[in-house]
Amino acid sequence: MVANFGSASPKVVAQTAPDRKFKFKDAFPHPGVDLVMGQRGSGKTAMGFWMMEQIHSLSGGAMGGAVLKAPAGVKKMLPEWIATPNRIKGIPTDSVVIIDEAQQVANSRRSGSSENLDMAQLVALSRQRNQLIILISHHSRKLDMNEVMDCSRVIWKKPSAGQVMFERKEMKPFAERAVQKFAERKGNHHKVAYVMDFENLSFGFAQTGLASFWSESLSTGYSGPDLGAMGTLF
């Protein structure tokens, strides 16, 4: 059901839209574009791989996976059905795509760069190419708003109040809501994500998990100094 907010401001929507319960297919639909944000160590990348594996399994293997610019140490720990292209143009169709540290690619200060133009095309054609693009970032401050506005879902994994202070003004009311909802929720926060349905302006928690191939080694592979081919962006 689409909420009727007319020309309401982001602040009004964030303060008045009701919560709902999300099932997997509603929280993480594909194809489309999801933006995943949250504080360091909250499990953003782990959730991205879990989403990827779930969709791969539900599709009977028809949907593959891809990780853009994966660190060298990470590549060898991934299943063979996950591609690791170093360029946006190398991302396969019919796939769930993880773009970690998305602000390095979709950067608001380099909106005219060839990399940003490739990203804009990737996002715009995600449905035609049957792709779910998962953009992972700590916050939206440095992201190009063109990519954010094309998202079907904005997802938070336990955002920090400090990071919300420096969010882009368009996203700040929604991030503040996410912080409040996590503060009110009891239990293990690592097992849930707070979802904003950007198409219908509805909100709610969804259950999350870990991919069968996820490990502490895979986790630390993303936290070390090796940033894969990230240097090609500069």
What would you call each of these model-derived segments?
Residues 66-72, 158, 196-202:
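Short, flexible beta-strand-to-coil junctions
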Residues 30-31:
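Pre-Walker A (P-loop) beta-loop-beta motif of ABC nucleotide-binding domains
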Residues 34-53, 83-172:
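Conserved P-loop NTPase motor cores
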Residues 170-234:
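Phosphate-binding and hydrolysis-coupling loops of NTP-dependent motor/remodeling domains
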Residues 50, 60, 69:
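OB-fold ssDNA-binding interfaces and closely related basic DNA-contact patches used
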Residues 67-92:
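Short glycine-rich substrate-engagement loop in P-loop NTPases that contacts/grips substrate
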Residues 54-64:
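Post-Walker A helix-loop "phosphate-sensing" segment adjacent to the P-loop in P-loop NTPases
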Residues 1-25:
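N-terminal pre-Walker A segment at the start of P-loop NTPase domains
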